[in-house]
Structures are given as C-alpha cells and as structure tokens.
Amino acid sequence: MHEIDLSKYNIRSDLIIENNFKKYLQESYTENNIQVDYVKLNKNNILNKTEGDYITISFEDITDKTNFSNVLSILNKELKRILKLTNIKPDDKVLIIGLGNNKSTPDSLGYEVLKNIIVTRHLFILDKVEGYRNISVLEPNVFGNTGIESQDIIMGVVKETKPDFIIAIDSLAAFSIDRMQRTIQITNTGISPGSGIGNNRGEISKNILKIPVIAIGVPTVVSSIVIVNDTLKFLTKKISYHKKNHQKDKLVINSTLNYLNEKDDLSKEEKKYLLGIIGTLDEITLKDLIYEVLNPIGYNLIVTTKEIDYLVEKFGKLISEALNISLNDL
C-alpha cells in the first residue's frame, strides 16, 4: 500500500481560534450574540505561533444596521484593550498600513480600511491637534504589482517618519467555511502577509521594525481543501440529523433545515461504512490527504463568496470607523 508522507504538508490557518487554543484562553464572553475570545500565548506554546495577545471576535452578520452597530461597539472595545496590552500611550504616533492587493477584491480589505481613516500627521507637523492622535497611512500594495517587498517599503517609511507603533490590516485565509467574513482577529504579534495561502512574504513585526505591530485581519478566502473537507463533514452531520429526526419515513426530505448547529454526528463505524477508510481519518489528516490530491495538479484553488465586493466594503467601513474612535478622543 502506498504510504503518504504527511509531515511535509503544513496546512495552516491564520486564525488562532482555529488552532488548539483552549489551554491559553484567558477570557471568553458573549454580548449581543457576538463571541469574544482572548488568548495569550507564551514563547514556547505548542501552537507554534508567535508569543503575544490574540483577540477573536465572532459573529453571524454585519450587513444590517443593528448587527453592524453591535460589532462596531465590541471591536472598538477590543481595540482599546489591545492598545492597553501593548502599552500604547495616548500621544504615541501610529502608522496604519493597508496590506494586500487592491486589484483583487478578497485581498483589498486593507485598501478599503484606509479610505476612511482620519489622517492627521500633516496637521501635527504644523501644530498639535487637540483630541486627535498623530496618524499616517500607507498602502504598500503587493510584490507582483510594485516589484518591491511590502516589508522593504514599510521599513523605509518607518525609518523616515518614525511612528511609535504600527497597525496593519490584511485579509486572512480561514480553515473552515463558517469562519469566512464572520470573524475579526486582533493581535499584537505582527503579521506575515500571504502566509495563509502559502505565499509567504517578509513578516511585519516588532522583531523586524523595532516598534509594536498590531494586526487586524478578516478571513475572506478558503482553499479547495477546506471546501472538500467541510462538505464531507456536512454530509455526515446531515445524514445524522435526518436519521435522528426520522426523515427516512417521509416522502420528501426538507432540504432547507439547518443541521449545522446539531451536536450529534455519525459514529466512527457509521462514517467508515459511508466513506470507507476516509471516514476514519481525523480532520487534520484528511485535510493533508486532500492537499496531496489537489496541490500537485494545480486544483487547490483559493475561493471566496459571491458577495465579497459588498462584504469587503462593509468590513472596510467597520474597521476604519472603529480605528477612528479608538485611536482618537472622539
């Protein structure tokens, strides 16, 4: 039998919430159906993640006025928390960086955020502005468009303008379908652009720039690996749900029922009967196996939702408004 070496496939998520984070969970609360999890990682953590603070905000929707307002309130509060955890003072100068590619909608979150940021650095050159922080912005774009690494551009700007800290905004890759456009991650560990889709560029962190780097990210894409894996998971949950609710006795199965929140699932034996040996694999092993199938033939596509144009614009407004409030005395 052909043995597959899975050790070389490091299928990963940009989100701390999709890793085995429970051991490091410091605080968790729910407000207006919005879940907030605060994780603090030490230097030698088993997740192989950078030491620091991670805040995850999970929600169902931001497209209507009420949900937008509720998420904005939480985001503003958690941004203030991360500023405090990072020891940022009220008069510290900030450079806000919009990472990504403005020609690719799923990767244009940083660009959308910068559109509505209140920029004040040019005013501070003349005199101090009461009630506002010294804020400048930068859109370095991507290596393929500029021929210059984002890290190099940022290092040059930091050297010349001397901000006290950086806030970087970027689109992320999720490890599950239900995280797409339903999660905001805030961390003071910096960021490695493109790492979630295997396109590692130079990291943007305190280690490199010598000043604190706060990163804000929203998952806007998943890979084909995730879609195939989640589809198999949804299949077993749907069969389990209909089995439990005796749908087999009905002439027509109601296809509109939402079974995702059901805790019951098929047993390991039932999964093996349905899917063969594939049904016995744990989630990580299954994703690694799907990677070996799709990646060599170039079919490990990066996928987003059909409403991405509208959602990226909404997230851009949400994050920029929260930053304007939390950074300034408004």
Regions found by a protein language model. Name each.
Residues M1-E51:
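N-terminal amphipathic/basic leader segments beginning at the initiator methionine
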Residues N42-K89:
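An N-terminal, well-structured beta->alpha segment
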Residues E78-R81, T105-H122, T183-S192:
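A glycine- and small-aliphatic-rich helix-loop capping segment at beta-alpha/alpha-beta transitions
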Residues L99-D107, G144, S171-F175:
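Gly/Ser/Thr-rich loops at beta-strand to alpha-helix junctions
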Residues E130-V158, K162:
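A structural-propensity feature for long, helix-poor, extended segments
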Residues L138-E139, A168-N328:
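A structural signal for small-residue-enriched, beta-sheet-centric alpha/beta enzyme cores
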